[in-house]
């Protein structure tokens, strides 16, 4: 049984949950989840957790994402995308220069209102379910960040561009906000998620077309996941103690990367097996001082233990 992360490709049409169901069916395991919903009309990278890989998905939701989007100026729909009912169509008299200026004005932080039709929850219910029942919930704006925008192409009313954005950013809302800035509104008509963190569409796998063996072979093992987090190595004899839930004291550590108090740290044994994720109780720079004074204090607090054998 493999545990880890799969970089999946979601085609247009299926929901993110459909991708999860396909992996469950082909790998014959119920422990499958995804790390960030991708709209049915969109395609691209969807991070899938398999078995104990589901327990680290929260860290993938916090990664930057890159999207390619095509929007249609002057078209306004209920859902802010091409699948929604048309609310209004307007003329767009903006010049190409004005369109580009409006797009680039959103680079940086701004307060974005999530669309009424989205997978976001309100009092335990998905917004899109409430909206279909006629219950439109107006959520407060959320501060998001557009790190950069490039490859802007203007062809009449259809405008495409790429954007690198913070987690939780709705590209549909960004398109509508650009449209409103131009005085005509806009709707996303095509959307591709090209990357999540360092994971790109080129390395993604369409699980609907892949055989079970290929899916299993493409699972990234836990030991190679979350490589942006600091790493510590404990003495081999501490393995069982940690897997049984014991907190990590200084004498257990053999070596460590630099880390700050409050950071999440990956805990490995000397064989290279990922044992746990833990929260640092101190800055790593202070550990040598503790060791010099022979103070065997707790330095890491367990958050998740991975007993995969």
UniProtKB/Swiss-Prot annotation:
Record-annotated active site: 39 (nucleophile)
PUA domain span: 229-306
Catalytic activity: uridine(55) in tRNA = pseudouridine(55) in tRNA
EC numbers: 5.4.99.25
Bilayer-spanning residue ranges: none
GO biological process terms, semicolon-separated: mRNA pseudouridine synthesis; tRNA pseudouridine synthesis
Keywords: Isomerase, tRNA processing
GO MF entries: RNA binding; tRNA pseudouridine(55) synthase activity
PANTHER family noted in UniProt: PSEUDOURIDYLATE SYNTHASE TRUB1, TRNA-PSEUDOURIDINE SYNTHASE
Function: Responsible for synthesis of pseudouridine from uracil-55 in the psi GC loop of transfer RNAs.
Listed name of the protein: tRNA pseudouridine synthase B
Organism: Thermotoga petrophila (strain ATCC BAA-488 / DSM 13995 / JCM 10881 / RKU-1)
High-level lineage: Bacteria, Thermotogati, Thermotogota, Thermotogae, Thermotogales
Gene: truB
